[in-house]
């Protein structure tokens, strides 16, 4: 997981990624999630990203093996923009549950840990 902060984070990412972050002239709002690619100078895919817009920051979820080159590749294009990229991989993790029994498994995890399911869900469109 990579974090992009700064007052020009959305403008910067909008220029660098394949997905439009300002569809219809309006920036994506907090908790919006889109998929995108980061392309290298030859137009080849360097990273397949999930872009999660939050208040004051944007999280880029990518393959762990692509994190370093994505940070250095995108960082090389930050010249005068107010944007900072850092790798949060050592402090954040993601678990995805898919399929018809996903909610049952999540209930079991919650019962074992005592953590409410609602606190585990980050995406507003997630179904519990």
Region locations from a protein language model:
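Basic, glycine/lysine-rich polyanion-binding surfaces/domains
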Residues: 1-128
């Amino acid at each position: 997981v990579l974090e992009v902060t700064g007052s020009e984070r959305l403008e910067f990412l909008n220029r660098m990624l394949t997905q439009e972050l300002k569809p219809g002239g309006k920036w994506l709002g907090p908790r919006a999630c889109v998929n995108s690619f980061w392309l290298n100078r030859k137009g080849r895919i360097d990273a397949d990203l999930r872009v999660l817009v939050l208040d004051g920051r944007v999280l880029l979820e990518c393959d762990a093996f692509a994190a370093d080159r994505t940070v250095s590749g995108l960082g090389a294009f930050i010249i005068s923009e107010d944007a900072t990229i850092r790798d949060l991989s050592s402090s954040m993790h993601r678990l995805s549950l898919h399929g018809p029994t996903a909610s049952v498994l999540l209930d079991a995890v919650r019962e074992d840990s005592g953590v409410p399911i609602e606190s585990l869900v980050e995406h507003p469109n997630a179904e519990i």
